[in-house]
Regions:
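Helix-loop boundary and gating motifs at the non-cytosolic
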Residues: 5-52, 209, 222-232, 236
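Core transmembrane helices of Major Facilitator Superfamily
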Residues: 23, 104-116, 303-315
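Helix-breaking motifs and short loop linkers at transmembrane-helix boundaries and internal kinks
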Residues: 38, 70, 91-93, 269, ...
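Helix-to-loop junctions at the C-terminal end of transmembrane segments
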Residues: 58-70, 258-269, 354
């Protein structure tokens, strides 16, 4: 292991695993447990949705907390929120509690992610960030595969309550890693002011209007991709197992490229992955509208896997590069809000386009938005590796 990775193994990489796997497990456990407690499908959907709402609502306050109290303190506070939510899931049996708990869970997740981004910005040089962030993104992809499987298996054998307690215990391990190894950064004890955030947004309006829009587009395309492939597979009459195979092949290609993407960013610049991946993304999403059988869907899914893998870490890396040292927390809070909006906009765009037209129209619509975003990346997003 190189010195680049040794320095962040305990404060960054291990907590990413200890929090990432439970976070992915919760995505399947929460709705299923709500159903088991007697809640309906609407209640289960609302609980999952409120977790996402909690993430967006907490983005800017988390940035303000990081600016005032420091990244380490914010990460520790966030893990207390997350672990407490997991533990309380196991202790309550009224569905009404889960609305509040899911919101707190989401707020804690957002706060931790922001604290980690800010910590990496301070702890890693610009020529290290691409690889470090790509490693984190790779661990998130691994967690997305392992988390639901492990969570479902545990729930089957030991029950939901004990499973949530296991998730809370895993978060404790992440807490200990950060508490014992993360470097304290001097906090800024100025009062937290919303006016300071709005002033920052105005001061960096050019950055948010270019690189910010590019990042929104990346997140929108990624989120839309996860919805479009299975929906189109169902539209073509493919069996569930066949659709799963298509998604899995795309995911394997994606995972294989996460670290090479980080190396390219650190050696040749951020645009070296941002420009080609955005163009590939837009073209492949539009090409989904032409897929009419298993082989054509698989071919497009492979290209989407390449695009997603090549773009690994680009959004977080751009954010850390562009964040001003003196206002890092507030800037990253605004940055995360933009990216969360992009993630939410992807499925909503697909839903609206399908309602008004068809799944093919949805693919074309997202592809067109991606093309506009790739133009912004090519024409207006400057190289941030200095």
């Amino acid at each position: 292991m190189t010195s680049i990775h040794r320095g962040v193994l305990f404060p960054v990489y291990l907590p990413a695993v200890f929090l990432g796997v439970p976070a992915q497990a919760v995505l399947i456990l929460l709705p299923l447990y709500v159903l088991e407690l007697g809640g309906g499908v609407a209640a289960a959907s609302a609980v999952v949705g409120l977790r996402g709402v909690g993430m967006m609502v907490a983005d800017i306050p988390a940035g303000m907390l990081a600016a005032r109290f420091g990244d380490r303190v914010v990460m520790l506070f966030a893990m207390i929120l997350i672990g407490s939510a997991y533990l309380t899931y196991a202790l309550v049996n009224e569905v009404s509690w889960f609305y509040l708990l899911a919101f707190i869970n989401g707020a804690g997740s957002s706060t931790f992610l922001l604290g980690r981004m800010s910590y990496i910005t301070a702890a890693c040089s610009p020529r290290e960030r691409g690889r470090v962030i790509s490693m984190i993104a790779g661990s998130m992809r691994g967690a997305a595969l392992l988390g639901p499987l492990a969570g479902a298996a545990l729930a089957e054998f030991i029950g939901f309550e004990a499973t949530f307690m296991c998730l809370a215990a895993t978060v404790v391990l992440g807490f200990l890693c950060v508490a014992m190894t993360a470097i304290d950064d001097p906090p800024d004890l100025k009062k937290m002011r919303w006016r300071a955030v709005t002033d920052l947004a105005f001061e960096y309006r050019g950055v948010f209007a270019t690189a910010g829009i590019a990042s929104i587009t990346f997140m929108l395309m990624r989120a839309a991709r996860t919805v479009l492939i299975p929906l189109l597979g169902a539209e073509l009459g493919l069996e569930t197992t066949v659709i799963g195979l298509v998604v899995s092949v795309s995911a394997i290609i994606d995972v294989a490229l996460f670290y090479p993407a980080g190396m390219i960013m650190d050696r040749h610049g951020r645009r070296a992955t941002a420009v080609p991946s955005s163009i590939l993304f837009a073209a492949a999403l539009a090409a989904l509208s032409l897929a009419n059988d298993f082989y054509s869907l698989l071919a497009v899914a492979i290209v989407l896997g390449v695009a997603n893998g090549l773009s690994t870490g680009i959004v977080m890396t751009l954010g850390t590069d562009l964040a001003p040292a003196a206002r890092r927390g507030e800037f990253l809070g605004l940055w995360r809000l933009l990216t969360d909006l992009g993630s939410a906009a992807g499925p909503l765009t697909v839903s609206l386009a399908v309602t008004l037209g068809s799944i093919q129209a949805a693919a074309l619509c997202v592809g067109a938005l991606g093309a506009a975003g790739s133009l912004v990346v090519y024409r207006f997003v400057e190289e941030t590796l200095k």
